Every structure is written in structure tokens, then in C-alpha cells.
């Protein structure tokens, strides 16, 4: 998931990258952005991609900064959001080094901290903390490791219903996932279209924010339909549905 990868993906972003905004049918993200909105405050979208969330942020904050690792994604974001006069676009890799960033009151970060490198993820979270004003709010969305495991279990069940033995059903999932590395699974790293992608446990997120200068307000599911996981899922496959984790947290005031 380096710069070259994201610049390459940018050309077919809508078909290659899952749209959380389009599948957030209960508008959980939108309502939280509106909750923290202020015409006097500033916001950032870290990992903005081609700008899906920028119109919402632009409508709800005085000024918005759109950060992304890939210039080609930013080019599309500028084009898609050309009518937004209060957005600045910045190319930056927040996972490799500290950069000078203007402080903001609200940060949106949707499925951006998903690189397999723990050191890069740690630097990214440090960048978030440094970028946010004391008392400011973070809205974070990350893939759920529980959901990924649960989806595999449902796929095994589906394979069995199609006539495979249990062992064969398990191996079909294993082989279909490019024989996932056990060392990756121990870290919550799951292959998505053969790309190692960090997923998070709920308890892992709780522990993570205990170590940061944040008060954790909320961890809840953003649920999606089974079509987001499988092509042509069977009608019998219903709830519980797969999900991402949505986190809201507030940066502590300095004493």
C-alpha cells in the first residue's frame, strides 16, 4: 500500500475501493460529522481518496484540509470537489514521518490506517494526535477483525451447503484467501484482494486509545450487506451482517 499502489488504484477508484459513505445506510458517519460541526471550526480528512466525504465536511466546517498519499487521488478529489472553495489539498504520507500540519478541531479518518506495518500505523496515530487541537474530536473508521473472521465462517457454511465436506469447505476459504500467513493473522492482517490489510479488534481499539492522549467516547458497528463481502450471496445469508468499526474520541486538554 505504497504511493505507487494508490496512484494506480486512483484510475479505477470507484470500482477498486469500497465506499464506506455509499454503504453507510444509517448515515452514522454523516450524523456524527454534523454533531461536531461548527461554522467557526476547522477539519481534516486524512486519507481523503478522491474526496467522497469532502462535500459533507465543507458544508459543516469553516475550512477543510484534504490529505492523501497519492497525487492522482488528490487530482480527482480537486476535480470532483471543484465547487468547494474552503478546501485545501495536501499530498502527504502521514505514516513515514512527522510533517508540519495546521491544527484542526475535527479529524475524519476512514479506512486509512490499514497498512500492515505496525511502525507506520503508530506514526500515523501520532500524526493524528499532533494535528488535532486539545479538546478536538476524531472520527475513525477501521476494518473489523471480528467481522473478517465471521465472514470466513459464513463462507465455510456456504461451501458446506453447496455440498463440500467441512474440511474441504475450510480449505476452499483458505486457498481463496491466498493462503493467509499465520503470522499476519496473529496481527489482525487479512488479505483483501491479495493485499495485506490491517483489521482491528474492538478490545484492541480500546487498548490503543488508552495509550493515546484521547478519551474514547464510542465504538460501534457500521453494518453492511453481504454483497460487500461476496458476489451473489445466497438469500438465506442474513443478519448478523459484516461491519467496520466506527470510533469517536476526544483529545484530552492539557492540564
Give, region by region, the residue ranges found by the protein language model.
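Conserved class I S-adenosyl-L-methionine
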Residues: 1-38, 139-171
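Class I SAM-dependent methyltransferase SAM/SAH-binding core
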Residues: 44, 50-96
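A conserved beta-strand element that flanks and buttresses the S-adenosyl-L-methionine
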Residues: 108
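Acceptor-substrate binding/catalytic loop of class I
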Residues: 116, 189-204
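Conserved S-adenosyl-L-methionine
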Residues: 214-225
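Core SAM-dependent methyltransferase catalytic element
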Residues: 232-255
Amino acid at each position: 500500500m505504497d504511493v505507487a499502489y494508490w496512484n494506480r488504484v486512483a484510475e479505477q477508484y470507484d470500482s477498486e475501493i469500497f465506499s464506506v459513505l455509499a454503504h453507510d445506510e444509517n448515515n452514522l458517519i454523516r450524523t456524527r460529522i454534523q454533531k461536531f460541526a461548527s461554522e467557526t471550526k476547522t477539519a481534516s480528512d486524512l486519507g481523503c481518496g478522491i474526496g467522497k466525504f469532502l462535500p459533507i465536511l465543507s458544508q459543516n466546517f469553516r475550512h477543510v484540509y484534504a490529505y492523501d498519499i497519492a497525487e492522482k487521488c488528490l487530482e480527482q478529489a480537486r476535480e470532483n470537489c471543484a465547487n468547494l472553495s474552503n478546501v485545501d489539498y495536501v499530498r502527504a504520507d502521514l505514516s513515514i514521518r512527522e510533517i508540519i500540519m495546521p491544527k484542526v478541531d475535527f479529524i475524519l479518518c476512514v479506512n486509512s490506517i490499514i497498512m500492515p506495518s505496525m511502525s507506520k500505523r503508530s506514526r500515523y496515530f501520532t500524526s493524528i494526535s499532533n494535528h488535532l487541537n486539545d479538546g478536538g474530536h476524531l472520527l475513525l473508521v477501521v476494518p473489523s477483525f471480528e467481522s473478517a473472521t465471521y465472514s470466513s465462517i459464513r463462507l465455510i457454511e456456504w461451501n458446506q451447503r453447496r455440498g463440500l465436506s467441512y474440511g474441504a469447505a475450510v480449505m476452499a476459504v483458505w486457498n481463496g484467501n491466498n493462503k493467509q500467513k499465520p503470522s499476519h493473522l496473529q496481527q489482525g492482517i487479512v488479505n483483501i484482494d491479495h493485499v495485506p490489510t490491517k483489521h482491528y479488534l474492538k478490545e484492541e481499539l480500546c487498548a490503543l486509545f488508552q495509550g493515546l492522549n484521547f478519551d474514547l467516547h464510542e465504538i460501534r458497528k457500521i453494518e453492511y450487506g453481504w454483497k460487500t463481502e461476496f458476489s451473489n450471496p445466497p438469500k438465506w445469508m442474513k443478519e448478523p451482517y459484516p461491519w467496520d468499526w466506527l470510533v469517536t474520541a476526544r483529545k484530552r486538554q492539557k492540564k
